[in-house]
C-alpha cells in the first residue's frame, strides 16, 4: 500500500509469528502535511484490515487492541485531522487538542461519526487499491510467507515486476 500511494520507499517486510508482521518504510518529505498526505496515511494504516477482509473474508483484532496499533494510530490521525490540523469539516480553523480522543468521542458523538467516516473512507480506499493491484498483493504475500522477511531489493523487485506486468 505504501508503494501504491507513493508515500516513499519500502525498505523491508517481515512476519513475526508471535507479534504479527511489520514493515520498514521511508517517507517522501516533499508531500507531507497536506490533506492528501494525511488521507494516504489513513489509507495505509487501514490496509492491513482491508487485506484481511479481502483474503480471509473476516477481520481479526490484529489491527487494533493497543495504543500503538494501526487502528489506534489511524483513529488518532483522523481525530487530529478534525481537531488540530485544520482539515476538519466543522470549525477547521480552531485548534482543539486533547490527550484522550476516546473521552472526547463519548461527549461528542458528531465528532466520533466524522472520525469514523474518515476511517471508513480510508478502509474502502485501501480495499479498492488492493483489489485493483491484486496480483502485486498476492506476489508480495506469497514471497513474504515463503521468506518470512524481505529486504528493500527483494520488495522493490516484486513491485517493479508487478508494475511492469500487463
At which residue positions do the language-model features occur?
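Soluble catalytic regions of large protease machineries
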Residues: 2-166
Amino acid at each position: 500500500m505504501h508503494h501504491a500511494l507513493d508515500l516513499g520507499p519500502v525498505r523491508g517486510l517481515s512476519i513475526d509469528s508471535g507479534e504479527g508482521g511489520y514493515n520498514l518504510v521511508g517517507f517522501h518529505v516533499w508531500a507531507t502535511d497536506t490533506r492528501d498526505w494525511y488521507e494516504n496515511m489513513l489509507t495505509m494504516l487501514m490496509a492491513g484490515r482491508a487485506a484481511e477482509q479481502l483474503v480471509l473474508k473476516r477481520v481479526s483484532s490484529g489491527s487494533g487492541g493497543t495504543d500503538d496499533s494501526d487502528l489506534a494510530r489511524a483513529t488518532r490521525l483522523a481525530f487530529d485531522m478534525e481537531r488540530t490540523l485544520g482539515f476538519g469539516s466543522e470549525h477547521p480553523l480552531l485548534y482543539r487538542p486533547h490527550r484522550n480522543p476516546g473521552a472526547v468521542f463519548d461527549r461528542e458523538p458528531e465528532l466520533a461519526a466524522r472520525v469514523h467516516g474518515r476511517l471508513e473512507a480510508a478502509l474502502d480506499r485501501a480495499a479498492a487499491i488492493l483489489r485493483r493491484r491484486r496480483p502485486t498483493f498476492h506476489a508480495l504475500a506469497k514471497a513474504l510467507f515463503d521468506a518470512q522477511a524481505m529486504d528493500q531489493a527483494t520488495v522493490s523487485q516484486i513491485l517493479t515486476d508487478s508494475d511492469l506486468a500487463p
